[in-house]
Amino acid sequence: MKEQITICGAGLVGSLLAVYLIERGFSVRVFEKRKDPRKNEADAGRSINLAISHRGIHALKDAQTGLEKEALKLAVPMYGRAIHDLHGHVSFQAYGEASQHINSIGRGALNKLLITTAENLGVHFLFEHTCTDYHAAGEQWLFSDITGNTVATQSKEIVIGADGAFSIVRSFLSKQQQPQPQIETLEYGYKELEIASAHTETITNNQALHIWPRERFMLIALPNEDGSYTATLFLPLKGEISFEALQSDQDIQLFFKKYFPDTENLFPDLTEQFYRHPTSKLFTIHSSNWFNAHTLLIGDAAHALVPFYGQGMNAGFEDCRILAEIIDGKSKTNWSEIFAEFYNQRKENADAISDLALQNFIEMRDHVADASFLLRKKIEKHLHQELEDAFIPQYTMVSFTDISYKEAMETGLLHQKILDEIMAIPDIEAAWPTEELKNKVITVTKKYI
């Protein structure tokens, strides 16, 4: 008889995990509090498009042959950042080599694909079922539907919480374990705005992440498959320039005219959208308790992070791949060992990408239009071209390889030290890129690697 596993959450991570587990011979059922998203639109306030890069694609490919190809049919490639200055001038910054790109993909479309894929393999989905209780003594979970009918798991059945940043499974586990999860809230919020395809004629590069960096805040826009864009305004919640300060039609219109003048034609219904779309908060979840003997947290339920590196979904998908690899490496399914090994592998990497995401917010918001920053990027590119694998830029490690997040973070700190020394070379900003300087930066770098 097949061992049954229950997953709480049919979002992106939960539905992909279901594919991995049923492919390994388990009987899998998934409880989800929402209605079936194949019959309903995406939840208001949730990001409706995301960035999928190498780690996420690798996880899709390993889950089922060809799944990554089906997903990428729904995606738009983004080869770099299109930076919009205060005067409406646009400059392009490539993410890496000419062929390297991340992909903008609709959350809803990808979620539907993954649910259908899992369902076709035999996964049983129970929508409109909420996790309502946990009986610690018998290690039994209860799920209730909208009519009040209750479904109980078997005693000590394996339950995996993939129910996101506001995880109910995590909240029940935290009542049994110490220390409590810590929520690190940013002073920023975000609001999504839609740019209809009919209003995009002024956007000249439709294969880029568009950024309007304004130091303390920024606007970004990701392309969608239908030619539209999803824009997101990141702004302090309170203060002189903040969501709190934008209270009237005039406030909103003057703010966009002053700071994002080239977006005037993109949002003909700006104020209506601004009021209609919710302002959401940004936060990071720090938890050291991801599991007990028969329960595991995965994805955002274990390690929610801010969206500024585009790695939330990728990290969650990588969780699924790593968990499956650990299961495959065991001759006998000892869940306590599997969960402990998963935690030991993923916790330090989750902490690393959480820190990197916060750092990337500062980079996107403050530095992408700075001349010194741009020179550092040019020198970084030169070092990678000359030294190849001996000097891989941090962004490349995170977005285009399977190098662990922890290693990427630690190597990035070393690179920062190298580049600080290089930038201290007299007159480098004025003289770059002479052959003498190109050779000198190689010499400096080789002292460290």
Swiss-Prot record:
Keywords (A to Z) from UniProt: FAD, Flavoprotein, Monooxygenase, NADP, Oxidoreductase, Pyridine nucleotide biosynthesis
Superkingdom of the organism of origin: Bacteria
InterPro entries associated with the record: FAD-bd, FAD/NAD-bd_sf, Kynurenine_monooxygenase
Catalytic activity: L-kynurenine + NADPH + O2 + H(+) = 3-hydroxy-L-kynurenine + NADP(+) + H2O
Cited function: Catalyzes the hydroxylation of L-kynurenine (L-Kyn) to form 3-hydroxy-L-kynurenine (L-3OHKyn). Required for synthesis of quinolinic acid.
Protein name (record): Kynurenine 3-monooxygenase
Organism: Cytophaga hutchinsonii (strain ATCC 33406 / DSM 1761 / CIP 103989 / NBRC 15051 / NCIMB 9469 / D465)
GO molecular function, one term: kynurenine 3-monooxygenase activity
Record family assignment: Belongs to the aromatic-ring hydroxylase family. KMO subfamily.
UniProt record, GO biological process: anthranilate metabolic process; kynurenine metabolic process; L-tryptophan catabolic process; NAD biosynthetic process; quinolinate biosynthetic process
EC number: 1.14.13.9
